[in-house]
Amino acid sequence: MGKWEGTGNQTLGLVSQSGRFRLRWQTRPEPGHDAAGGRFKLTVHSGVSGRPLQEVTDQRGPGEGAYNVEDDPRPFNLMVYSEGLVWTIVADEVVMARPATR
């Protein structure tokens, strides 16, 4: 679905055909900033109405994590709020497999 890297606040758009996707993120200190400082907040918003749907993380300092989003198929916006950190976000569509029937 997508991969983004950056610093500071950004709005990232994506479209999920299933409404199910996994977000993975990693943050590290920006050059010249305190290695233990910084803040990273990631929320998922509707790309249609703009309303917030889910808060993914609100972390202090560098780190990483993953979060599964389950919603209706639609456009989404990822809202990034970041201070003092370089971030990378990867979004992958989740495909649900069903056992074969005989």
Predicted regions and their residues:
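Acidic, Ser/Thr/Pro
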Residues: 1-102
